[in-house]
């Protein structure tokens, strides 16, 4: 496969890609234990596909955005061509070191692809090769086999916790070295006042799209979550009010029956625990006000962080401690760009003028700078000039439009990965 994935990987927004061999594997509830730990997961539905076709673009994009792929298989006879084709791409990503693969087998038995191989004999060899490679990868993980032997909930939680530790252990290297992070963290720590347990404190983080609000919040979560008895990172608070009901509704009730993402918070509220709650994507005053007003459900010393694009929303919600994540400074932006374009702190002398131009076109926004730098790395001056000229004509576009432009400039199609 000749495709280059580097510029796509720079724009990652997901953490974990969940792949399933079939419905039995899908029934294992993995997403809850990941999401409550602030790990954003994508559940693939490729297992539903029984006919031969390339992986759909959304699934392929999710795979390129993810750092980890969890492949869950059962002893059922594999009839899903979609799962097998997806597995081929997952293994290729793993071999290129752009993805960590964690196999989870629900039984000791190997996958059986005999019948589906009879229907598509030309694919049989490559499917069996991918399965063999998955077995080899499994040898690295003690929890890959015998999942069904132990209590399902316990084992799933153990695996989710292992993945969480994997992300926390790499948080410093992923985030701390980013340009401007130390400056942001110093200011945010002052607002958090973690040394004080006198009361619940609500903090607001705001800034324009792509400026790095979520990156800052995720790093903060990784750094301080261990200080709290309960913690959760909510990616979407659209239905939070319905999810976290008044405490009397939980008395004598099995908390697992309530929306999974909020179980931890509901239990913490009931037991008056010290909580860290980070709510991303707060987009209206009702949401902000409701979260801020009800923060006192939790024990003194709890911290609630709201993330939004609108400062006025925070003010009107009664949030007194507010931090703006502004665009990167000139030197920070150039340093970040150089890290992705040249794998060093500063631009190569021959490319300094072009690097400054690229940073300006990126609007000093971290997510766009990472995309530009990753796309341009290894290219000659002529290619830089042509790329920047096309991007200059598209100034003012949002990040999704920029992504499409970058894809259009790439002369190889990433869908080749699913057709080998």
Swiss-Prot record:
<dbReference type="GO" id="GO:0061809">
    <property type="term" value="F:NAD+ nucleosidase activity, cyclic ADP-ribose generating"/>
</dbReference>
<feature type="domain" description="TIR">
    <location>
        <begin position="12"/>
        <end position="167"/>
    </location>
</feature>
<dbReference type="GO" id="GO:0043531">
    <property type="term" value="F:ADP binding"/>
</dbReference>
<keyword id="KW-0520">NAD</keyword>
<keyword id="KW-0963">Cytoplasm</keyword>
<keyword id="KW-0611">Plant defense</keyword>
<dbReference type="InterPro" id="IPR042197">
    <property type="entry name" value="Apaf_helical"/>
</dbReference>
<keyword id="KW-0539">Nucleus</keyword>
<protein>
    <recommendedName>
        <fullName>Disease resistance protein CHS1</fullName>
        <ecNumber>3.2.2.6</ecNumber>
    </recommendedName>
</protein>
<feature type="domain" description="NB-ARC">
    <location>
        <begin position="185"/>
        <end position="406"/>
    </location>
</feature>
<dbReference type="GO" id="GO:0005737">
    <property type="term" value="C:cytoplasm"/>
</dbReference>
<comment type="function">
    <text>Confers resistance to low temperatures by limiting chloroplast damage and cell death, thus maintaining growth homeostasis. Regulates steryl-esters and sterols accumulation. Limits leaf necrosis associated with virulent bacterial infection (e.g. Pseudomonas syringae pv. tomato DC3000).</text>
</comment>
<dbReference type="GO" id="GO:0005634">
    <property type="term" value="C:nucleus"/>
</dbReference>
<feature type="active site">
    <location>
        <position position="86"/>
    </location>
</feature>
<keyword id="KW-0378">Hydrolase</keyword>
<dbReference type="InterPro" id="IPR035897">
    <property type="entry name" value="Toll_tir_struct_dom_sf"/>
</dbReference>
<dbReference type="InterPro" id="IPR027417">
    <property type="entry name" value="P-loop_NTPase"/>
</dbReference>
<dbReference type="GO" id="GO:0046713">
    <property type="term" value="P:borate transport"/>
</dbReference>
<dbReference type="InterPro" id="IPR002182">
    <property type="entry name" value="NB-ARC"/>
</dbReference>
<dbReference type="InterPro" id="IPR044974">
    <property type="entry name" value="Disease_R_plants"/>
</dbReference>
<dbReference type="InterPro" id="IPR000157">
    <property type="entry name" value="TIR_dom"/>
</dbReference>
<dbReference type="GO" id="GO:0007165">
    <property type="term" value="P:signal transduction"/>
</dbReference>
<dbReference type="Pfam" id="PF01582">
    <property type="entry name" value="TIR"/>
</dbReference>
<dbReference type="GO" id="GO:0006952">
    <property type="term" value="P:defense response"/>
</dbReference>
<dbReference type="Pfam" id="PF00931">
    <property type="entry name" value="NB-ARC"/>
</dbReference>
């Amino acid at each position: 496969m000749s495709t280059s994935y580097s510029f796509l990987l720079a724009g990652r927004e997901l953490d974990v890609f969940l792949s399933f061999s079939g419905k039995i594997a899908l029934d294992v509830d993995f997403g809850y234990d990941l999401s409550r730990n602030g790990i954003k997961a994508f559940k693939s539905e490729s297992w539903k596909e029984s006919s031969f076709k390339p992986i759909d673009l959304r699934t392929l994009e999710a795979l390129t955005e993810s750092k980890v792929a969890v492949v869950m298989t059962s002893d059922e006879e594999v009839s899903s061509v979609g799962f097998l084709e997806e597995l081929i791409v997952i293994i290729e990503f793993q071999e290129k070191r752009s993805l960590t693969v964690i196999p989870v087998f629900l039984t000791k038995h190997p996958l059986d692809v005999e019948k589906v191989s009879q229907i598509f004999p030309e694919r049989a060899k490559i499917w069996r090769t991918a399965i063999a490679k998955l077995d080899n990868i499994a040898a690295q993980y003690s929890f890959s086999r015998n999942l069904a032997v132990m209590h399902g909930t316990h084992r799933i939680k153990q695996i989710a916790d292992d993945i969480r530790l994997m992300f926390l252990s790499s948080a410093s290297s992923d985030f701390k070295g980013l340009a401007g992070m130390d400056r942001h963290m110093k200011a945010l720590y002052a607002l958090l006042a973690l040394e004080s347990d006198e009361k619940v404190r609500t903090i607001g983080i705001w800034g324009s799209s792509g400026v790095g609000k979520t990156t800052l919040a995720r790093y903060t979560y990784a750094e301080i979550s261990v200080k709290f008895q309960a913690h959760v990172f909510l990616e979407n608070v659209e239905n939070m009010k319905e999810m976290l009901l008044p405490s009397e509704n939980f008395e004598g009730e099995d908390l697992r029956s309530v929306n999974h993402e909020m179980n931890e918070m509901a239990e913490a509220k009931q037991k008056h625990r010290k909580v860290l709650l980070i709510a991303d994507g707060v987009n209206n005053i009702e949401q902000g006000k409701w979260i801020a007003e009800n923060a006192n459900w939790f024990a003194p010393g709890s911290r609630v962080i709201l993330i939004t694009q609108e400062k006025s929303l925070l003010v009107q919600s009664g949030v007194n401690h507010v931090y703006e994540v502004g665009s990167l400074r000139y030197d920070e932006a150039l340093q970040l760009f150089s890290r992705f374009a040249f794998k060093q702190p500063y631009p190569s002398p021959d490319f300094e003028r072009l690097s400054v131009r690229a940073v300006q076109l990126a609007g000093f926004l971290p997510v766009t700078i990472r995309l530009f730098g990753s796309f341009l790395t290894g290219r000659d001056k002529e290619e830089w000039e042509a790329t920047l000229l096309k991007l200059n004509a598209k100034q003012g576009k949002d990040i999704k439009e920029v992504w499409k432009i970058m894809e259009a400039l790439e002369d190889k199609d990433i869908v080749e990965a699913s057709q080998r």
